[in-house]
C-alpha cells in the first residue's frame, strides 16, 4: 500500500520534466509515443535482470499475451486500491485514509464528503501519482500488443466516434 507522500517528493523534478516535455514537442515527437517507449525500455530492463519478468518484445503466443495482460490487470487492481485510499487523505495515515472506501469506519461519511480541492497539495499530488501508477500498467498493455501512439489514436478516435453515434441513436 502507498505511504503518505511516497511519490510527492518526485515533484521536485517537475522543472526537468517540464523541460523534457517542451523538448519532445520542439522535436515534433508524440508525447504518448515517448511514454510508450520509456515504459517498453523499463520492461526490457526488468526482463534482462529478472528472469521471471516478461520481455514485451517476446510475447509470441496468445497464452503469453494472456499472462502479460493478467499481470498488468493485477498491478492495476493493486494501484487502484492505492488510488482509492489516497482519496481519503494519506496525510492521515493509510489506516485512516482507507475510511474513504470502508463503509464500516466511523470517518466514512466525512471522508466521502471531503472536497478534493480542500485537501493539502501533498494529498492531491499523491492522488495524481497513484493514477499515473495505473497508467504505467495500461501503457504496458499497449506495449505488449506492439501498439504505437498513432495506432492507439486512430483506434481511440474510431471508437469514440462510434460511442457518440450510439448515444445519438438512443443507446
Curated annotation (Swiss-Prot):
Say yes or no: keyword Hydrolase present.
Answer: yes
Name the Gene3D superfamilies on file: Type II deoxyuridine triphosphatase (1.10.4010.10)
The reaction(s) catalysed by this protein are: dCTP + H2O = dCMP + diphosphate + H(+)
E.C. numbers: 3.6.1.12
What keywords appear on the UniProt entry? Hydrolase
Q: Which domain of life is it from?
A: Viruses
Q: Which organism is it from?
A: Enterobacteria phage T4 (Bacteriophage T4)
Official protein name in the record: dCTP pyrophosphatase
Q: Name one Pfam family in it.
A: dUTPase_2
Amino acid at each position: 500500500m502507498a505511504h503518505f507522500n511516497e511519490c510527492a517528493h518526485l515533484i521536485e523534478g517537475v522543472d526537468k520534466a517540464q523541460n523534457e516535455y517542451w523538448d519532445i514537442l520542439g522535436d515534433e515527437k508524440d508525447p504518448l509515443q515517448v511514454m510508450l517507449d520509456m515504459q517498453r525500455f523499463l520492461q526490457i530492463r526488468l526482463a534482462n535482470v529478472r528472469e521471471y519478468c516478461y520481455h514485451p518484445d517476446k510475447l509470441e503466443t496468445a497464452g503469453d499475451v494472456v499472462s502479460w495482460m493478467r499481470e498488468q490487470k493485477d498491478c492495476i487492481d493493486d494501484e487502484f486500491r492505492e488510488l482509492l485510499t489516497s482519496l481519503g487523505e494519506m496525510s492521515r495515515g493509510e489506516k485512516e485514509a482507507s475510511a474513504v472506501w470502508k463503509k464500516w469506519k466511523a470517518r466514512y461519511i466525512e471522508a466521502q464528503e471531503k472536497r478534493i480541492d480542500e485537501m493539502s497539495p501533498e494529498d492531491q499530488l499523491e492522488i495524481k501519482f497513484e493514477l499515473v501508477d495505473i497508467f504505467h500498467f495500461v501503457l504496458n498493455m499497449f506495449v505488449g500488443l506492439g501498439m504505437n501512439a498513432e495506432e492507439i489514436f486512430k483506434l481511440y478516435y474510431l471508437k469514440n466516434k462510434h460511442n457518440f453515434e450510439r448515444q445519438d441513436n438512443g443507446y
